Swiss-Prot record:
Disulfide bonds join C389-C392. The lineage of its organism: Eukaryota, Metazoa, Chordata, Craniata, Vertebrata. It is an enzyme of class 2 (transferase). The gene is FUT10. One of its GO terms (biological process) is fucosylation. GO terms for molecular function: alpha-(1->3)-fucosyltransferase activity; fucosyltransferase activity; peptide-O-fucosyltransferase activity. It comes from the Eukaryota. This is GDP-fucose protein O-fucosyltransferase 3. Protein O-fucosyltransferase that specifically catalyzes O-fucosylation of serine or threonine residues in EMI domains of target proteins, such as MMRN1, MMRN2 and EMID1. Attaches fucose through an O-glycosidic linkage. O-fucosylation of EMI domain-containing proteins may be required for facilitating protein folding and secretion. May also show alpha-(1,3)-fucosyltransferase activity toward the innermost N-acetyl glucosamine (GlcNAc) residue in biantennary N-glycan acceptors. However, this was tested with a library of synthetic substrates and this activity is unsure in vivo. Its EC number is 2.4.1.221, 2.4.1.-. It comes from Bos taurus. The chain crosses the membrane at residues 10-30. It catalyses: L-threonyl-[protein] + GDP-beta-L-fucose = 3-O-(alpha-L-fucosyl)-L-threonyl-[protein] + GDP + H(+); L-seryl-[protein] + GDP-beta-L-fucose = 3-O-(alpha-L-fucosyl)-L-seryl-[protein] + GDP + H(+).
Length: 478
């Protein structure tokens, strides 16, 4: 009888909690709906904001993926939720009340919230960050947050001091970011120590009769890192099997020709047969590390790495990769690889960490353990969720400070949050000219992006809407 009474009491409590949550959510929907029903008609809006007239005016039903539990001590009113406005269609969500620990914020891509009094932060996605449309004038309580996990080739102007310092919060590949995404392509330690795809060295030696010691798979040709020029020169000193669109000399099976198959077991089996993989990033930036590195380490193949200058800080072991930067010329690199190819003991030293399942790099272990998001893990938030919650929490922290009569804490990004030098080119001999794509596109693009960054900063600091004509006139003023 006591158990039945307890069960009824528990059910009653749950019903009450659910009712309270629904009432709060309904109030928020009604209040925001009243605001959203008012269409902006500002004659002062210029090119970038004219498109707001076409924004949808219906409200997406609120939902909360984890269930909203409010702290009673906060005594939050229904209209107290800060609005986080995505200045990008990235999430596709026109309205969502999301919980971030004990805090809650309203996330939306609907730009009709631009002038709402509860809009506290604007969230930008770096790849589609554009001068054509910015939320200006920027009010004192408007925070700007940048999510940019990709290389500089997607938007060079972000990588210069005048622009990156416009943002209060960042989530980038840099360890110095407020939400570092350095390990965004690595699921965890288990995939590094797994022997699932490992091909024994004896078998690899046998396969060498028909395979080159090195394999190269790239279909994004002539990127800012100029990797194809290096590999082309390397090919004159050692055999390289190239399966991608770039420098291809060996075809993939038809069923693996689709780029979507790059994570297929069949593709992994092909790569795992090789002793070495050329792991060259498309850009050279501190902490910019992609699947180019992690894939060979997962497969038990030694990566020959070119990319992040800080890569040694992230390798699982002191001897787990060959770094191109340690060789003065592809000729020296080829000689070293041939020596390892002939000497099983020296080669084995590069995969010893994997065979023993030992990751000695404490920085890597700590980063994986402490990150607040997961990779392909339904039990964890993804990094976009984590970014949203980071901004939401920081906004709430400042709200609480102001409620105590204290000034809000000001955050600002700096150039270490996206650290990429100007692209350079490889020119190994007069017979191998510099790649036209770099000379005629990437380097001038980087140089012009400096002017664009200065012009954009001046216009944003003016804190008025501006046209694309104004922007480009300022860029080419000198």
């Amino acid at each position: 009888m006591v158990r039945i009474q307890r069960g009824k009491l528990l059910a009653f409590c749950l019903c009450v909690m659910a009712t309270v949550f629904l009432l709060i959510t309904l109030q928020v929907v009604v209040e925001l709906g009243k605001f959203e029903g008012k269409k902006f008609k500002n004659s002062h809006l210029k090119d970038g904001h004219a498109q707001m007239e076409a924004e949808p005016l219906h409200l997406h039903p609120f939902f909360n993926r984890e269930g909203l539990t409010l702290n009673r001590k906060k005594t939050l009113a229904a209209d107290s939720f800060p609005i986080m406005l995505w200045w990008s269609p990235l999430t596709g969500e026109t309205g969502r009340l999301g919980q971030c620990g004990a805090d809650a914020c309203f996330f939306t891509i609907n730009r009709t919230y631009l002038h709402h009094h509860r809009t506290k932060a604007f969230l930008f996605y770096g790849t589609d960050f554009s001068i054509d449309s910015l939320p200006l004038p920027r009010k004192a309580h408007h925070d700007w947050a940048l999510f940019h996990e990709e290389s500089p080739k997607n938007n060079y102007k972000l990588f210069h001091q005048p622009v990156i310092t416009l943002f209060n919060y960042t989530a980038t590949f840099s360890r110095h970011s407020h939400l570092p995404l350095t390990t965004q392509y690595l699921e965890g330690t288990e995939v590094l120590t797994s022997l699932r795809h490992l091909v024994p060295l004896r078998s690899k030696n046998h396969l060498r009769k028909s395979l080159a010691p090195l394999v190269y798979v790239q279909s994004d040709c002539d990127p800012p890192s100029d990797r194809d020029s290096y590999v082309r020169e390397l090919m004159t000193y050692i055999e390289v099997d190239s399966y991608g669109e770039c420098l291809r000399n060996k075809p993939l099976p038809p069923q693996l020709s689709n780029p979507a198959s790059m994570d297929a077991d069949g593709f992994f089996r092909i790569l795992a047969q090789y002793k070495f993989i050329l792991a060259f990033e498309n850009a050279v930036c501190d902490d910019y590390i992609t699947e180019k590195l992690w894939r060979p380490l997962k497969l038990g193949v030694v990566p020959v790495y070119y990319g992040s200058p800080s890569i040694a800080d992230w390798l699982p072991s002191n001897r787990s990769a060959i770094l191109v930067s340690e060789f003065s010329h592809p000729r020296e690199l080829a000689s070293y690889i041939r020596a390892l190819d002939r000497d099983d003991r020296r080669y084995q030293a590069y995969i010893e960490w994997k065979l023993k399942g030992e990751i000695s790099n404490q920085r890597l272990l700590t980063a994986l353990r402490e990150r607040k998001w997961g990779v392909q893990d339904v039990k964890q938030d993804n990094y976009i969720d984590a970014f949203e919650c980071m901004v939401c929490t920081k906004v709430w922290d400042n709200i609480r400070l102001q409620e105590k009569g204290l000034p809000p804490k000001r955050w600002q990004a700096d150039v270490t949050h996206l650290s990429c030098p100007e692209p350079t080119v490889f020119a190994f001999s007069p017979l191998v000219p510099r790649r036209r794509s770099l000379r005629e596109m990437w380097i001038p693009s980087f140089q012009q992006s400096k002017k664009e960054a200065r012009a954009l900063r001046w216009l944003v600091d003016r804190n008025q809407n501006f046209s694309t004509q104004e922007f480009w006139a300022l860029v080419f003023k000198d």
